[in-house]
Amino acid sequence: MTQVNNSLGAVTISLHWLVGLTFIGLMAVGIYMEETHAYALYPLHKSVGALLLLLVIPRIVWRLKQGFPAAEGDASPAAQILAKTVQYALLAGTLLMPLSGIMMSAFGGHGLAVFGLEIFPMNPDPADPNEVIPFNGLLAQVGHVIHGLGGKLMILAVVLHLAGALKHHFIDKDKTLVRMVKP
């Protein structure tokens, strides 16, 4: 699926940067929370992640409807395959990360509140109110595995995406990066 026109419109550019920068911020906060056990950040991480899902779905629909822009310059077949793989990985990851986070939290009994609005209830343990009882431990674990592995794969995909953009701009000297800034 390739666009005939190489230019990108304001909707494409806006969704790209809004989703991309928000996602990078969520990944940074997620890593920080995991490394430092900063539990106070979890509600913010969950809230922004759930709202991001509301942007990701239209972005994916828009991208699939519009197609991917044609490659600039003369990329090798291997480079074209790598670029397309990274593009699809980023689209899939921006959908799977919020969904798996919601799945992990909701099925794990932790609930989900988006900026205080309860979407999925918590399931506190009556014997210990500081603990929760999973609604479905298996689905919570599946969400946890997808979220953890997906986060690592998304870091790789983002690094490859940024490296490709910089290569196009500084080595190939084509318009790939410029077209993501100006409609």
Regions found by a protein language model. Give the residues of each.
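Membrane-embedded alpha-helical bundles that constitute the cytochrome b-like, heme-associated redox core
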Residues: M1-P183
